[in-house]
Curated annotation (Swiss-Prot):
The gene is CACYBP. It comes from Pongo abelii. Residues 154-228 are annotated as: Interaction with S100A6. Residues 168-228 form the SGS domain. One of its GO terms (molecular function) is tubulin binding. This is Calcyclin-binding protein. One of its GO terms (biological process) is heart development. It holds the Pfam family SGS.
Length: 228
């Protein structure tokens, strides 16, 4: 029954209750009045609940903006130095001190470290260094975030030892670039190796000078003059 009809019934019962004089009739009308009032109350609660549900359904769903980290940039520029206890690597990243602490992560092994900076100005930054020159202490190594800088502290496993290079690869590359002098080889061969190295690394003027000296040397040798 509609709420309007129940309200009319209630008004009529109230009128009858005012006119009734016999107890039995009044008790019956009072019971009916309570019943109708309960029905009206339930109807109103149901109506309010439906209205609230409609309002909830009409609300636009909350849109959660995804956190995009964009692409990952590999870090290739850095500086390093050392103390008796630590090898220190300095990486410059503008604004890195403003990202949450958990966004700057470093994983250490005995001969490597892996830096990952997440969601810095919409990008992630990664730096992986393998084959460190010497072993480090994983437990003793750490990181520090300063203004626009990440400082990686690699604790030397053997203190008071000097690192001439950061990695074994760098050491091998540098050693290959050095002229080789073998005491057991002919001294003139060692000199030729040095000249060859200078020639390969020199500019056009240097190459012309060496070529001229080489030609003159060959001409002297052809004449029996061994001076160079």
């Amino acid at each position: 029954m509609a709420s309007e009809e129940l309200q009319k019934d209630l008004e009529e019962v109230k009128v009858l209750l005012e006119k009734a004089t016999r107890k039995r009739v009044r008790d019956a009308l009072t019971a009916e009045k309570s019943k109708i009032e309960t029905e009206i109350k339930n109807k109103m609660q149901q109506k309010s609940q439906k209205k609230a549900e409609l309002l909830d359904n009409e609300k636009p769903a909350a849109v959660v903006a995804p956190i995009t980290t964009g692409y990952t940039v590999k870090i290739s520029n850095y500086g390093w130095d050392q103390s008796d206890k630590f090898v220190k690597i300095y990486i410059t990243l503008t604004g890195v001190h403003q990202v949450p602490t958990e966004n700057v992560q470093v994983h250490f092994t005995e001969r490597s470290f892996d830096l990952l900076v997440k969601n810095l100005n919409g990008k992630s930054y990664s730096m992986i260094v393998n084959n460190l020159l010497k072993p480090i202490s994983v437990e003793g190594s750490s990181k520090k975030v300063k203004t626009d800088t990440v400082l990686i502290l690699c604790r030397k496993k053997v203190e008071n030892t000097r690192w001439d290079y950061l990695t074994q690869v760098e050491k091998e590359r540098k050693e290959k670039e050095k002229p080789s002098y073998d005491a057991e080889t002919d001294p003139s061969e060692g000199l030729m190796n040095v000249l060859k190295k200078i020639y390969e690394d020199g500019d056009d003027d240097m190459k012309r000078t060496i070529n001229k000296a080489w030609v003159e040397s060959r001409e002297k040798q052809a004449k029996g003059d061994t001076e160079f």
